[in-house]
């Protein structure tokens, strides 16, 4: 459920169905950081930034050493004007040895922020 919902979220398709799948997975496994991240990320991708923040904060609590989850939280912080916290999360994500593609994206955000 979560995998398909997250994949759809990343592709920007079937977002209503994706959210339903992810919420179902989150209800079944509320302590799974990856599923919690997916829920926060679908909220972010559908411009519900303030709603996404506490969920992504929880995801980071559950999976503190995951670069992608820290990056997602940084993005959400930026969108709700919490820029210092966003920069902190992005810098933290960089220290977790993300793959080259993610590292490059984060470095751009550190230089220019998000649009």
Language model features with spans:
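Canonical tetratricopeptide repeat
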Residues: 3, 38, 72, 105-109
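Position-specific recognition of the canonical hydrophobic site in helix A of tetratricopeptide repeat
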Residues: 9-10, 44, 78
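Conserved structural position within tetratricopeptide repeats
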Residues: 24-27, 58-61, 95
């Amino acid at each position: 459920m979560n995998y398909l919902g997250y994949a759809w979220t990343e592709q920007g398709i079937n977002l209503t169905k994706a959210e339903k799948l992810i919420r179902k997975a989150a209800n079944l496994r509320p302590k799974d950081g990856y599923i919690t991240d997916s829920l926060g990320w679908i909220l972010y991708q559908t411009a519900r930034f303030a709603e996404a923040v506490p969920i992504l904060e929880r995801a980071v609590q559950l999976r503190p050493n995951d670069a992608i989850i820290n990056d997602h939280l940084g993005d959400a912080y930026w969108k709700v004007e919490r820029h210092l916290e966003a920069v902190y999360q992005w810098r933290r994500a960089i220290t977790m040895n993300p793959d080259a593609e993610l590292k490059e994206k984060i470095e751009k955000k550190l230089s220019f922020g998000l649009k």
